[in-house]
Curated annotation (Swiss-Prot):
This is 5'-nucleotidase SurE. Disulfide bonds: none annotated. GO terms for molecular function: 3'-nucleotidase activity; 5'-nucleotidase activity; exopolyphosphatase activity; metal ion binding; nucleotide binding. The gene is surE. It comes from Methylococcus capsulatus (strain ATCC 33009 / NCIMB 11132 / Bath). Nucleotidase that shows phosphatase activity on nucleoside 5'-monophosphates.
Length: 251
């Protein structure tokens, strides 16, 4: 098996190194990752300029683009052989609920799915994570499970791991995405020249975080595994929308 690894924290991030070290005894590993931190890049592709891919001192391939760029290049011609699946992570921080819309880590996995490969995004749920060995062990266990029972090519698994020692984990939970309240206000300040600047505010607090959600699983010291889909259509509203639209509507 040939596994492509990427992330959004950059090619030198401890989480990516931990993931590569954990999976390399089990499969052929190729790492293609951003040359710098691109957290929050979501599914953006770089279209206004060419991209450069270079071999870093640690042997990883670094790209001067987004996580989506990295996976796209890797699968569509950068590599000599196409990988069989994509692992993205280990992200430095949770990707729970609404976070998946912004996450470059989840986007890297999503791009793998767009290009026909099963993909796993794995995140360590803490602001300053420490227990990368726990998330690495989870990645090993999931890979072993995938080998026993392969994932369909249209599968994206969003995995969040509590930042605790491995022996404190309380198992795995199949979860749905929770939700957050509205994000906090931007932080308004001034640069050294007195010009107004803004920092994006913090994510909103939990809104939908009850049993069955990814938030709840993490609070219970369980690994949260959420299956994601690409189709964002809200099917139960199609008929209502058709009745609401002005003029003649055709299906």
């Amino acid at each position: 098996m040939h596994i492509l690894l990427s992330n959004d924290d950059g090619y030198a991030a401890p989480g990516l190194r931990a993931l590569a070290a954990a999976l390399s005894p089990l499969a052929k590993i190729t790492v293609v990752a951003p040359e710098r931190n691109r957290s929050g890049a979501s599914n953006s592709l770089t279209l206004e300029r060419p991209l450069r891919a270079t071999r870093a001192e640690n042997g990883f391939i670094r790209v001067d683009g987004t996580p989506t760029d990295c996976v796209h290049l890797a699968i569509t011609g950068l590599l000599d052989s196409e990988p069989d699946m994509v692992f993205a992570g280990i992200n430095h921080g949770a990707n729970l609920g609404d976070d998946v819309i912004y996450s470059g880590t989840v986007a890297a996995a999503t791009e793998g799915r767009f290009l026909g490969l099963p993909a796993v995004a794995i995140s360590l749920a803490a602001h300053n994570p420490e227990h990368f060995e726990t998330a690495a062990q989870v990645a090993i266990e999931l890979l072993e499970r995938i080998r026993e029972n392969p994932l369909p090519a249209d599968t994206i698994l969003n995995v969040n791991v509590p930042d605790i020692p491995p022996d404190e984990l309380r198992g795995y939970r199949a979860t749905r995405l929770g939700a957050r309240h509205k994000a906090e206000a931007v932080v308004r300040t001034r640069d050294p020249r007195g010009r107004e600047i803004f920092w994006v505010g913090c994510a909103g607090p939990e809104a939908d975080a009850g049993p069955g959600t990814d938030f709840h699983a993490i609070r219970q010291n369980c690994v949260s595994v959420t299956p994601l889909q690409i189709d964002l259509t809200r099917y139960e509203r199609l008929d209502q929308l058709g009745a609401w639209l002005p003029g003649r509507v055709t299906a």
